[in-house]
Amino acid sequence: MISYGMGEHSIIEIADALASGLPVEELTYIAGTVFKCRDLSRVYDPIILPSYEEVKVNKKVYADSFAIQYQNTDPFSARPMAESYGTKGYIIQNPPALPLTQEEMDDVYALPYTEKVHPMYEKLGGIPALEEIKFSLTSNRGCFGGCNFCALTFHQGRILQTRSHESLIEEATRMTNDPEFKGYIHDVGGPTADFRQPSCQKQLTKGVCKNKPVSYTHLRAHETCADL
């Protein structure tokens, strides 16, 4: 079993299910997970993707499969997807987990992270790229832009999730206690095109409109999905 995306919801659900005595083979229902099965008898209304044998030899089929997957990254509208692997059965990807609420986002970033690299990297001289982001603040997740060059949708989704200002200030205050802190924060933001709020009034209950890339956002700023 694989937990994909950001993982907070699915990891907890997996742990609770295993703690209750369920075998891992029974955990076929958890959003934000991928699992292997022999047949599709326990998978409700799956989208059948091109087989592994097809996508590995045909670029057009590979692109077609990717397009189908891209259209099924919204937890409110996505369906399970099945890809066959010859005689070995199927790999099933369940729909993504629901996005975190602001309270859940705040809880995640309130945890006592060390902000240090794993000791295994010390003998290699650390991770140079960490120096640029160590004193940065993640304010949000997800992006509804839908830019053609970006695959962020596949692990953070298009539904914007934000932290409260209080949470950001608390983390910034903790940074000042780090002996390596030089007095300035490198960046406050996330993987979006400076989006901070949901793309429309229905995003958090109905999902994000399909086929509405970032170029649509400048048309009429206060429209809802229903208007479009």
Question: What is each residue range found by the language model?
Answer:
Residues 1-86:
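Glycine-rich beta-alpha loop elements in corrinoid/cobalamin-binding modules
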Residues 9-12, 101, 144-148, 156-159, ...:
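Flexible loop/turn segments at secondary-structure boundaries
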Residues 17-20, 154, 164, 199-215:
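Short secondary-structure boundary/capping segments
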Residues 61-136:
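N-terminal [4Fe-4S]-dependent radical SAM core
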Residues 124-151, 184:
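N-terminal pre-triad scaffold of radical SAM enzymes
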Residues 154-184:
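Conserved alpha-helical substructure of the radical SAM core
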Residues 176, 183-207:
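Terminal amphipathic helices with adjacent charged low-complexity linkers/tails
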Residues 218-221, 225-227:
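Single conserved hydrophobic/aromatic residue that forms the stacking wall/gate
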